[in-house]
C-alpha cells in the first residue's frame, strides 16, 4: 500500500528544468567560445558576427542561470522541508549521517536496497551541496572573465580583485573544468535517479514533472527531521478485499 505525497514544489521543479536548459546552452556556446568548431563562410552576411552571436547567447543564458540560482536559494528558506537548505548538510545530524552511510553502502553494493526517503537521501544531499558550490564558482569565474573584457561593466569592480590572485588563463581553465564536472554530474544524476526509481518504485523520475512521489504506508521518517514531515498526502484509493469463500 502506498500513499501519494507532494514533495517537489513548483519553484523546485521550475528551477531544476531552467538549470538543465541553461547548462545545455552554456556548455554548447561556452565550448564554442573556447574552441570555435563551426566554420562560417566569409560570404555569409552574418559570418563576422557569429562569435558575437554565440557570446551574446552565452551571456544572456548565464544571467537566466544566475536568476534561477537566486530563486532556488530564496525557496530554500521558504519552501517545504524537502526544499530546505538543511538538505545540503545531512552530516550535521545523527539521522543524516546514518542515512548517508546507508546510501553509501547501497552504491558500494553492500546493501541490497537504497534508503527509503521522501526527498533526497543524505548522500545525494551532500552531493548537491558540492553542486551548489560549483554553480556559484562557475558563475563567479564567468562574471570575472566578462568583467575583464568589459571593465566599464558593474562586474569588473566586483570581481576584478581575483586577477591579483590568479591569472586570466588559469581562471578560464577553471571555468571550463567546472563545466565538464557539471556535465559528468548530469550523466550520473540521470543514471542514479533511474536506478533508484526502479529499485524503490516510488515515481522518482516522474516526480520532477508532477511533484508527487509514492511512499509506502508506515515508511520511516525522513532524515531531515526526526519525525514525519507534514506534507500534502493523498491516499491512494483502496480496493475492498474480496469476500472469503465459506468453509465447508
Where are these regions (language model features)?
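Membrane-embedded alpha-helical bundles that constitute the cytochrome b-like, heme-associated redox core
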Residues: 1-248
Amino acid at each position: 500500500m502506498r500513499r501519494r505525497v507532494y514533495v517537489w514544489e513548483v519553484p523546485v521543479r521550475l528551477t531544476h528544468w531552467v538549470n538543465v536548459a541553461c547548462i545545455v546552452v552554456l556548455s554548447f556556446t561556452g565550448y564554442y567560445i573556447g574552441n570555435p568548431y563551426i566554420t562560417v563562410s566569409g560570404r555569409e552576411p552574418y559570418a563576422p558576427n557569429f562569435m558575437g552571436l554565440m557570446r551574446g547567447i552565452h551571456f544572456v543564458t548565464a544571467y537566466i542561470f544566475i536568476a534561477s540560482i537566486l530563486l532556488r536559494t530564496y525557496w530554500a528558506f521558504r519552501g517545504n522541508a524537502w526544499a530546505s537548505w538543511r538538505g545540503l548538510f545531512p552530516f550535521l545530524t545523527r539521522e543524516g549521517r546514518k542515512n548517508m552511510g546507508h546510501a553509501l553502502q547501497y552504491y558500494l553494493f553492500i546493501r541490497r536496497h537504497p534508503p527509503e526517503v521522501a526527498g533526497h537521501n543524505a548522500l545525494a544531499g551532500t552531493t548537491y551541496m558540492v553542486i551548489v558550490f560549483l554553480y556559484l564558482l562557475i558563475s563567479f569565474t564567468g562574471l570575472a572573465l566578462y568583467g575583464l573584457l568589459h571593465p566599464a561593466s558593474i562586474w569588473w569592480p566586483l570581481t576584478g580583485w581575483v586577477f591579483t590572485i590568479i591569472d586570466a588563463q588559469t581562471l578560464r581553465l577553471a571555468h571550463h573544468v567546472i563545466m565538464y564536472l557539471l556535465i559528468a554530474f548530469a550523466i550520473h544524476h540521470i543514471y542514479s535517479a533511474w536506478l533508484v526509481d526502479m529499485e524503490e518504485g516510488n515515481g522518482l523520475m516522474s516526480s520532477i514533472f508532477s511533484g508527487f512521489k509514492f511512499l509506502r504506508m508506515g515508511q520511516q521518517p525522513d532524515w531531515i527531521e526526526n519525525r514525519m514531515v507534514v506534507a500534502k498526502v493523498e491516499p491512494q484509493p483502496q480496493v475492498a478485499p474480496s469476500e472469503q469463500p465459506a468453509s465447508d
